Regions:
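Substrate-recognition/cap regions that form aromatic- and gly/pro-loop-enriched pockets
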Residues: 318-455
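Short, well-ordered beta-strand elements within core beta-sheets of diverse protein domains
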Residues: 122-128
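Histidine-centered catalytic/metal-binding microenvironments
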Residues: 435-544
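Glycine-rich, aromatic-lined ligand/substrate-binding cores of catalytic
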Residues: 219-368
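Sec-dependent signal peptide recognition
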Residues: 2-8
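A contiguous strand-loop segment
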Residues: 20-118, 138-289
Length: 544
């Protein structure tokens, strides 16, 4: 039974396509003093809305079920805390935000009999913590007490004042756990994307917290024999290979490269040169990042770099789609090849950019900008951290991974994006116009909304929280309505690989009232050249 469980676990990792991306911005690295972090939760078939755990006082002796976040399988029970806090999505009422990416690590370190998984650690951590530091304590204590059953994991833990990265792995059959947490400097940005990121632990000029057995366990297993000061977490527990660098670290490299010249580390991201200079855990950006900068970073396809997939090569199809089918690697005539794996990817189940601000009342300061599909294909909707009722579109009765609903954001957004993907260069501008219009309206409204909420908060806290909750839900439902309109617009505008002309925001009609003659754009020139190069004279029209 144990062997079967481990086989399933490793199979899940191999087929997940290197899921998930997190970016982190310290408060002195942001334009307004916010701590910010992001999360793309990526996995094929993943259907997850906006979760909610209400604040509660629990009777003494209460127990809570532990259910594996990925498989929904029951693991066991643990004692419940006396008090738990309100959680909406991946942020709680104290603005604590926790995200993750899975990196796997050494297979023999997995403990399938462990009593708690990474997803449960995240949401219990959110329910029991007022700060990122407290979340580290809660999560590591739980893993040490009950055993950790997941693979190697990198966690992002942020609050309005601090940003941390923590990595954790089990210790196999003995049921223990090793972990290390690094505070990201306030003026820095960091990230992780399914490859362990913590290097030589003693080299970080910042706060470091780790398990007592972090080095001792590695020595016991014969994986590390050097001096303590030279202990390198990832080279010991999860050494980067080609995939770890090209599919994973390259996403972080590209994020960094948007904000500082990272050409020195390009060879590391390319993954071929084994002697390439390793990429730092964090960098200080040339300019401070705004919320909009970070949203743009979540939409990255390596544009403008040697890894770019928005080019005119044949992999993007006729209309230059900056997406590629999976699996990431494939074989042709006995040779193995691969596709790039950018941050923006079609298998995103949900995405967020979390904004945490220390100068505002906590329920106003924390905003989870949330969407239910690829970050490039959605408008990030503001969800305030004190909200207690989810928008229906993010929590739709009856909708799931195999049940479509036009009341559900995941399905409506995927409906649109899956129309756009194969005809990207034609159709994406229409989506982008709607997306940017919505996001710009949310951002322009934010100061006035929060000013009103602040005034209400001073007189009646409950009224202020209700106002923000209603505002979030209204914007989410507005987004859904606009996306439905976009879906019907796209099918009319681009029906049958033609383009219907417009005038003054309406489809043109003839004087007699029927639809105007459609345009037939044919192949883009770059694709036509490749097509003829491949087919030669097969389709050449003979001269009369």
């Amino acid at each position: 039974m144990k062997r079967f469980y481990l086989s399933l676990l490793l199979l899940a990792l191999c087929t997940a396509g290197f899921p998930c991306t997190n970016f982190i911005v310290g408060k002195k690295a942001s334009t307004d003093g916010s701590v910010m972090c992001t999360y793309n939760a990526d996995d094929y078939g993943m259907f997850i809305g906006l979760c909610h755990y209400p604040a509660a006082i629990h009777p003494k002796g209460s127990m809570r079920d532990i259910v594996d976040w990925d498989s929904h399988k029951y693991i066991g029970k643990i004692p419940e805390a006396e008090q738990t806090y309100n959680v909406i999505g991946n942020i709680n009422e104290y603005q604590v935000t926790i995200g993750e990416t899975t990196y796997g690590g050494r297979e023999e370190m997995v403990n399938p009999k462990g009593g708690i998984d990474y997803g449960s650690l995240i949401y219990i951590g959110l329910q029991r913590s007022k700060t990122a530091r407290e979340a580290i304590k809660v999560m590591t204590t739980l893993a040490e007490t009950y055993g950790y059953c997941s693979e190697g994991e990198t966690f992002t833990l942020c609050d309005p004042n601090e940003a941390w990265i923590m990595e954790m792995q089990g210790t196999g059959k003995d049921g223990g756990v090793v972990w290390c947490a690094i505070r990201i400097p306030d003026d820095a940005i960091s990230g992780h994307a399914n490859q362990s990121r913590i290097g030589v632990v003693s080299s970080y000029n910042t706060e470091v917290i780790h398990s007592k057995n972090m080095i001792k366990y590695a020595r016991k297993m014969g994986w590390f024999t050097g001096k303590d000061k030279d202990f390198n977490w990832k080279m010991t527990y999860a050494k980067p290979d080609f995939g770890g660098r090209r599919y994973c670290d390259a996403r972080v490299w590209s994020f960094f490269n948007h904000h500082k010249d990272m050409s020195r580390y390009l060879d590391w991201a390319l993954g071929v040169d084994k002697k390439a200079t390793d990429m730092p855990l964090w960098i200080v950006p040339d300019k401070k990042l705004s919320l909009q900068d970070l949203q743009k970073d979540m939409r990255d396809h390596y544009e403008g770099t040697p890894l770019a997939i928005d080019s005119t090569n044949i992999g993007g199809g006729i209309w230059q789609m900056p997406y590629r089918p999976t699996p990431l690697s494939f074989k042709v005539d006995g040779k193995e090849y691969f596709n790039e794996r950018p941050t923006s990817t079609q298998q995103t189940g949900f995405t967020y950019v979390s904004q945490m601000r220390s100068w505002l009342p906590r329920e106003i300061g924390g905003v989870l900008w949330f969407g239910n599909d690829d970050g490039n294909m959605i408008a990030y909707v503001p969800i305030y951290c004190g909200n207690t009722v989810q928008p229906e579109c993010f929590n739709t009765p009856g909708a799931d991974a195999v049940t479509f609903s036009d009341r559900n954001a995941y399905w409506v957004c995927n409906w649109v994006s899956n129309m756009v993907y194969p005809r990207y260069s034609q159709m994406f501008p229409s989506l982008k116009q709607v997306r940017d219009s919505l996001e710009n309206s949310y951002i322009s409204q934010q100061p006035a909304v929060e000013q009103k909420a602040n005034s209400l908060y001073e007189k009646n806290k409950a009224e202020a929280l209700n106002y923000l909750n209603n505002y979030s839900n209204q914007q989410a439902q507005q987004m859904l309505a606009r996306w439905k309109q976009l879906a019907t617009y796209l099918i009319v505008k681009y029906n049958d690989m033609t383009v219907k002309p417009e005038e003054n925001g309406h489809f043109k009609r003839t004087p007699e009232g029927i639809g105007a003659r459609v345009q037939r754009p044919g192949y883009p020139h770059s694709f036509a050249q490749k097509y003829i190069k491949e087919t030669g004279s097969q389709y050449e029209v003979p001269k009369e």
